[in-house]
UniProtKB/Swiss-Prot annotation:
GO cellular component labels: HslUV protease complex; proteasome core complex
Gene behind the chain: hslV
Gene3D superfamilies referenced in this protein's UniProt entry, alphabetically: Glutamine Phosphoribosylpyrophosphate, subunit 1, domain 1
Protein name: ATP-dependent protease subunit HslV
Entry EC number(s): 3.4.25.2
Alphabetical list of InterPro entries matching this protein: ATP-dep_Prtase_HsIV_su (IPR022281), Ntn_hydrolases_N (IPR029055), Proteasome_sua/b (IPR001353), Proteasome_suB-type (IPR023333)
Originating species: Cupriavidus metallidurans (strain ATCC 43123 / DSM 2839 / NBRC 102507 / CH34)
Length: 178
């Protein structure tokens, strides 16, 4: 069976603002199955942003677990992320899940991987997915050379990724926190 491929998720933190955005394309083999998927969401009463890349079903499973961890730790993003990563790495069924998450609250941005990694990105920029390297490079250049707010940086970075990565489109969902 073919795998679902691709997406681009990027987060930019500047000053007291953070933006997290993603494209809407879901690809199966060489066919675009959907162009309007919503891979960026607000959770925990709108206080936490989360974006996911990888297998859609796996990502939703992880998203549900992450929300439960946030409730358990009363919104403490770091503790919830570390606990999820620990479960993800040690649980035999979870270990097979193929997805990555970027999470952000008003203070912290984290990348959570299936290897058990919880990464605090340097420079306030994080990106995952098939177009992640393009988006991260573009965001880094924009942050270092402009005064654009995070939402605009995310939009421009996603646009560049969409022009270069065949698994990324230009139908964006961007969420922000101040």
């Amino acid at each position: 069976m073919e795998q679902y491929h691709g997406t681009t998720i990027v987060s930019v933190r500047r000053g007291n603002q953070v933006a997290l955005g993603g494209d809407g394309q879901v690809t199966l083999g060489n066919i675009v199955m959907k162009g309007t998927a919503r891979k960026v969401r607000r959770i925990y009463n709108g206080k936490v942003l989360v974006g996911f890349a990888g297998s859609t079903a796996d990502a939703f499973s992880l998203l549900d677990r992450f929300e439960a961890k946030l409730e358990k730790y009363q919104g403490n993003l770091t503790r919830a992320a570390v606990d999820l990563a620990k479960d993800w790495r040690s649980d035999r069924a979870l270990r097979r899940l193929e997805a990555m998450l970027i999470t952000a609250d008003k203070d912290t941005t984290l990348v959570i991987t299936g290897n058990g990694d919880v990464l605090d990105p340097e420079g306030g920029i994080a990106a995952i997915g098939s177009g992640g390297a393009y988006a991260q490079s573009a965001a880094k250049a924009l942050v270092e050379n402009t005064e654009l707010p995070p939402k605009d940086v995310v939009e421009k970075a996603l646009t560049i990724a969409g022009e270069l990565c065949i698994y990324t489109n230009t139908n964006f969902v961007i969420e922000t926190l101040d």
